């Protein structure tokens, strides 16, 4: 069994989601053949932990913690960067440049880094989204829901009226589009259960050219078994026809809600689920310590 020190600049109780996620993966044995030796929060604690020995790797869960490592370190070191990480200062970039590998949640985070990087992707607790495991009632949406109309979620900051204008009058009138990025949508979706309930019960999520409700909203939708309709095509008839076809199926079924897309859920679980993320950490760490 290999041992890793987790290093964070945050005080106890104020750790980032990314740090807690990696710590949980180690503590629940989701990183095969790796265990957490300890967590340290400053350079002095790191020296003490290393002096105790039996450590294979130090992993910095935020860029500020990478400053704990001396330039002449004699141990393997990796770091993580997440989409919600604070903007990097030039000093933080210099510190990350000294680690052996930085694991990125998304490709866009590589900008400005000179160190070796690997895109590990996001980690998602798919069970929280999967309606077969956590089935959230439609009543969470009662204030805006109308079960006589086809429920759609708009996951980007786009104009609902422009979308409706591309549909026939009949289909437009039958659609209840919840604009997640609007003031009304933000007021409704003020808790994870409500967001997940919308993804579980919407016939589809529409994604346009505007900024997304969440950087990983398409992944969240897939984990909830919610189909995604791409509204960014050059010809709006492409997605307008798709919505119309979906409406025909919904109407033919008597307005009965769709079945979850089980294949989409399985894909997310296999690529970004908790165990998949643990295996990705194992692979990255094994490469570093074998160099």
PLM ranges: what are they?
Residues 57-62, 70-88, 100-104, 118:
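Active-site proximal beta-strand in glycosyltransferases
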